[in-house]
Every structure is written in C-alpha cells, then in structure tokens.
Amino acid sequence: MKSSSNLKSLLKNIDRKGYHAYKSTQGTYDFGTYFLSIDHVQGDPFASPSKLSIHVKGRSAGFPASFYDTKYKQVALCDHLTRLFYQTLSKISFRAKGSGKSGLFSVSKCGQQVLERTTCTIDPSNGDISVHFEAGFPANGRTVNARELDKMLFGLLPDCVSSSLFYKNIDQKMLESVIYLSEDQHTIRKTLSSMGLVAFIADGSVLPRENGISQKPLRNCVKFQSPDTYRVSFELPHQGMITGMGIPKGITLIVGGGYHGKSTLLKALELGVYDHVKGDGREFVITDPTAMKIRAEDGRSITNTDISMFINNLPNGKNTVSFDTEDASGSTSQAANVVEAMETDSSLFLIDEDTSATNFMIRDELMQRVVLRDQEPITPFIERIRELYERYGISSIIVAGSCGSYFHPADHIIQMDQYIPKDITTVAKDAAKDFPMVSLPEKKHPDPCFDRCFNAGNHLKKERKIKMKTLGKDAFSINKDTVDLRYVEQIADTEQTTALGYALLYTKLHLMDGKKDLCAVADELMQIIETKGLSTILDSKYVKSNLAMPRKQEVMAAMNRYRKL
C-alpha cells in the first residue's frame, strides 16, 4: 500500500499535464489514522465527480461495540456519521478553485428518515468504518491543477475526517441519544404485532410538515393526543413508559371534516415504516413494516397480473386472470396495486379516498339498481375488504370524508376533530343501521395467482451499453425506458430510487430466468443484499455513494412498473 507522501509526490509530477494524468492517482493511500482510496477518476473536469472513500480501522475509530452490535444500531450509527461528515464536508466544498466541478466535495444529504446507505458502512466484526463520497478534481481548463487537489486532500479533508469519524472527537452524548432512540424504536417495532396492532402514534407526536415540499415538522401545531379507548403503552429501555394510540389489526376507518387532519395522519403512517431522527416529531410513529399505500394510478402498465378478484367479464373479453395493459384505468390500476401488494406479503393497506377510484371503492344503492350486478365488471373493494382480513390477514386503514359505506365493514372508526382523534365506533355503527348495505358480498373468490415468471433481460444484454439514470425521487430510466414511481408514495429518498433502478437491472440480468416467480426473485435479491451488502447490485468496480436501502415492497413496485418486464 502506498503512503500519503507517495500521493503528494505523484501530484507534483502530474501538475499541469493533461487531465487524463489524474487517472494515475487511483489507488489506496495511508494517511496514518485513516486510508484514502481514489476509486474512480472522472474523465474531465465537467464530468461526474471522482469517487473516493475513507477507511478507518475500528481500533482507531474507537466506537463502542455496543453501538453496532445489531443491524438497526449499525444503520443508526452510520446514518449519524453520514450526517456529521456531510456537515463538515459541505463547509469545504469549492474552496479549491478551477474549471468545471473543480473543488467539489459531495456526500449523501440525509433526510428525516434513518436509512441504510452505501455512503457509510461499519464492519460489525471489528468496527472498521468506510465512507464513500465524491470530489471534483481541480483543473485549469482541461489540465491538471495538482496544487489545488493537494489542498483538498491534504489541507481540507483530514480535519473533516478527524472531526466526524472518530469517537473521541464527536459529541458522544448526541451519538448515545441516537443509538438509544434506535433501540426504543426497535422495541416498539418488534412488539407491535404481538400486541395485536398495525400502527402506533405516540402522544405528543408532531404529524404535520412545514409545507408541501418539506419533511421538517410544522411549528406551533396541535400535537397528537390518543383517545382513551385506543391508548396503549410501551415500556422502552431508554425513554421509559410511552403512551399513544395503537391502531388494532382489522379494518380501521378514519373520518372527519375537511382539513381536520385525516390525510396528515395517514401520510405519517405511510412513512412510519421507517425510523425518524430525533426532533422530527414522528420518532414514535411506528407502522407495520410491510404496510403499502394503495391508490389509483391511471396510465400505468400492468403485466400478467391476476386482477380477477376485482375485475371480471370485461366487454372486450380481455382475460383478467393474467391482465395486461399499457394504459390502466383508475379502477384497474388500483385493483392491480392491491393484488401486487398482496404478492409482496403486505399485511396492511393504507388507502385515502381522495386518491382512489370511486368505482373501485364503492357502488351506491341507486347505481346498483340502475346498473345490475351482472352488467358491472367491477367488484368494489368494500365487498372484499373483510375477506382480505379474515382470509389473508391483511388489515386496512382507510381515510374517508364523503362516503359512509365503510362504516359497515369497519371494526374501528376514528374521527379526526380539529386534529384530535376521537373514537366514534359505537356512534357510527348505530347510525349505519339506518342505512343498510344493499350490495351483498360475493362468494369467496379463488386465491389470486402469483406465479408470474419473467425471462432474463435478453433485450438488455444485446445493448452495447446499459445506462441507468435517476430522474429525481419519482422515476428512473434504463436506457430510454422510464419507470414512473410518482405514485409509489412510500419512497422516502432519491437514493432509494437509484437503488431501485440498479435492483431492477440486477434482477433482469442475473435473477430472472423464466422459472422463478416475481416474489421469489425479489426474495432472492433481498437475501443477496442482506448477505453481501447493498453495493452488490451495482454494475461498477467501485462502491457508489448514492444508494439507500429500499423495502421489498418498493422493489416489486418498480418491477411491476417496468414496461419491458
């Protein structure tokens, strides 16, 4: 292994040469307390920045083993270190000068959710830490400006590494609180199901966000307060006794007037599948980890999905046991979203009336009298909701503000009244007796068919070059084919979208074989990631710093929206 002095000498030798001379710097260098790896050098100063990584031996980093002895603690620790490294690195970015991206330092900017990322990892066997980031190697025009790179790597970077990646130099109390919070959150998650619950919202939680494009908490808002009938408590290892609203398994209806907080509560539950940082307000909003938001998605593609549970006898004679379309309607898209969620082993559906297809959710009495059952291809969700719970163990939480039909099948009815939840189950059930359901549930339907098998991506293998490009949080493209994820609403971070793009590529090129069904492929992928790490799915020789761990549910959602599946 080369020493840092070797790198210093090399930089002197290549100064003012053509930019391509930077390629000779690739390798790993010993900086005494850490190792710097130059993993990939950009082709010119205007190209994507160079890829670098820092490696600190566990005995030097000095983090207590009790802070990374479980997976969830490792994620919390690495998330915190990434935030610290980002704070210090952003202060020195562009202090070195030059053309193009010269002087840039860049690393993942974490949001409110705590996610596993390729940016920072820790080896649980010895505490070794690796951090991956980007840097723009300085140039004058298109010639090497080695003096400025020397400034970046020897003058600026060492202090960033020292102040953020060594236990003795960081705020130890703050880190301790991060680890303790992760333990408390994990305690609730692991006991939620055994308590008969699908979600928990702690008293005092702050659910609304400051605006429509921010995930930061709204100041001076009404804090969450559980109704007595739904209040449960958890004894946490560090927080102690905590109380809040436990939403039981079964069918829960959330009602209330407009702007009273129904959708805000549901949105918090959607993201409750992730841990949140201290101060977010949703630290103890915990949802079943398999929960899926279900909505209408006009225009999406559907490939060989069995939607016959909800759609049958189409006038064009189209087969709904293996349904295909490039342009789904509201009802067929929502039917597909339900069945595909079942395929992912989801045990909780989250549904908002505002984003649902009305004809998929209900058929009122007058419509049933005018358009007879044998003339209607759609079996509405209301007729399947009890079967989904009693037969498949899938609970539902539904937000409704204009339709009272779901009072009948609901087990629990909660009214949001000026942002405060109230238990109105008895009152609502009594009122519903005066409006009996005319629609009778159909006989039980055969289990949906989940044997969809897809061939390897031969069309991709024929391509001379395969390019995956992330298009913000809501989409990615593989060559010229865009995968639209706008309505996969539980993606929390752009780096998850990037990971989904590489995951889809990996499954098409390495796992799909025409024999394994889609769920088996997804399970195999998740097992590979669990065993070998998220960076396994990359197509490069170096670890990219821009991947965040998605759930199996989003992995399969991305697969299902790929139009060349």
Residue ranges and their predicted role:
Residues 1-187, 191-196, 207:
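N-terminal accessory targeting/assembly segments
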Residues 300, 310-331, 363-378:
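Flexible beta-alpha connector loops of hexameric P-loop NTPases
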Residues 193-199, 203, 259, 266-297, ...:
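Carboxylate/His-rich catalytic cores and anion/metal-binding grooves
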Residues 242-274:
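Glycine-rich phosphate-binding P-loop
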Residues 416-497:
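Conserved P-loop NTPase
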Residues 341-385, 389, 402-408, 412-429:
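Conserved P-loop NTPase nucleotide-binding/switch module
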Residues 484-565:
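Terminal-proximal interaction/regulatory segments of ATP-powered molecular machines
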Residues 208-243, 278, 286-291, 295-302, ...:
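N-terminal pre-Walker A segment at the start of P-loop NTPase domains
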